[in-house]
């Protein structure tokens, strides 16, 4: 299913590329275009990721990735079932701006591989690289349930967006991995839908339409 969605997304990007606003490939040297594509993918990812933590229905999709109380490479594959779909509206902006869909796809795979490496406790501080890149240390913070670590370090490849937009937090104390309210189950179906069940239960008990909208689009009531 993931590969089908990836293929459909690539096809959509090629379609949208016909309506690009800027002919970037004719303006920039190819090596600059590649670098800029990596930067823009991470820029879009930062906001997609940040919104996924602050909008309730997107958090219901994303929270399964944070449900593990361990931190290792396997956690990077603990992905939300509907995650690839939720990303589409955000990343479709890139081909519309004029970024080549083929370069987007390749750079996206490389960025994903970097993200996989970030899910580990084996790699410590990487010195000067900590200022620019989202290192394993920074990503451990992102998976922390410690109060000061919640909703921090959203970047995938770079940490510069977090530094710019005020969501950066260094790894100063041991990280307690998982959710504030842990799921206490290994059942993938329960983990995937428990956030949705909470949303619909809250909507069912809402007093008016505005309150129902808040439960769906507002921030998570309890930061799970």
PLM region descriptions:
Residues 1-5, 28-180:
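Membrane-embedded catalytic scaffold of the fatty acid hydroxylase/desaturase
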Residues 8, 31, 109, 153, ...:
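Alpha-helical structural motif
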Residues 8-32:
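Juxtamembrane/interfacial segments at transmembrane-helix boundaries in multi-pass membrane proteins
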Residues 12, 129, 161, 196-200, ...:
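Generic structural signal of hydrophobic/aromatic residues within well-ordered alpha-helices
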Residues 16, 20, 137, 165, ...:
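Generic secondary-structure transition motif, activating predominantly at the C-termini of alpha-helices
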Residues 174-224:
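Cytosolic-facing loops and C-terminal tails of multi-pass membrane proteins
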